[in-house]
Amino acid sequence: IMLPNHAPLIVAEQFGTLESLYPNRIDLGLGRAPGTDPQTSFALRRDPSRANAFPNEVVELLNYFHPQDNQKIHAIPGMDLDIPVWILGSSFFGAQLAAKLGLPYAFAAHFAPTHMYTALDIYRKEFQPSQFLEKPYAMLCMNACAAESTEEAEYLFTTLQQSFTQLIRNDRKLTPPPIESMEQYWNPYEASQVSQMLKVSAVGDFAKVKEEIEEILRKTEVDELMFTGVIIRQDSALLRLSQK
């Protein structure tokens, strides 16, 4: 949830509803970015200045789940439910906030890996134990695209590469089908930018992807991994998800 787009009370009640329907299966991740283009942000009635209030709104939301003494407003459902709340981020700000509040931290390496190691280090060094966690707990989100062969995986991965190129061009469209080669699609600048944005990606046959994932775990020592994979062919996507 990009919290500046929503009222904390509404988020608490919505996730309280989900937790009531599916106990112990719901986590809530909170970010401060708009998460969309300016036009959509405006349609959501987003106030650009609300990003500055993000730390206070996180605390407000936590208090709806765990009410303070003499608190007048309550989330129903939501109150007294144990819903894990994560701080999402790709910069030092989120790492420091998660550490200060003693919350788990999820780093968005799937599109903004530049500060990955430093942000995780800051989070761990500055972490303050809380009612939620006794010690730091971190997750890394990364891209993964596995196939029977590395060639097929690289072919399928061009869908995501094209999408990120469109983002750089400010020309976002529907998810494109894969293409045989990116050489004719992007220019050198775009290739460099997209490659940096997608740097934390495991692409290849199943053995290669497994090896690359294990390497990321060794380097980051995160507690959990979350994978994202944009595969436009349903049969291929289902196959990839079914592989261990």
Q: Model-predicted segments: where are they?
A:
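Active-site beta-loop-alpha junctions enriched in small/polar residues
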Residues: 1-3, 31-35, 90, 110, ...
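Active-site mouth loops of central-metabolism enzymes
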Residues: 1-8, 79-89, 147, 197-206
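Flexible, glycine-rich active-site loops centered on histidine and acidic residues
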Residues: 4-66, 105, 113
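Structural preference for beta-strand elements that scaffold enzyme active sites
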Residues: 25-29, 84-86, 104-106, 137-139, ...
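An alpha-helical appendage that flanks or caps ligand/catalytic pockets
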Residues: 48-74, 115-222
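Aromatic- and glycine-enriched pocket-lining scaffold segments that form the walls
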Residues: 51-104
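A conserved active-site cap/scaffold subdomain adjacent to cofactor or substrate pockets
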Residues: 93-114, 119-120, 124
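Short glycine/threonine-rich loop-to-helix capping motif typified by GTGT followed
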Residues: 149, 235-243
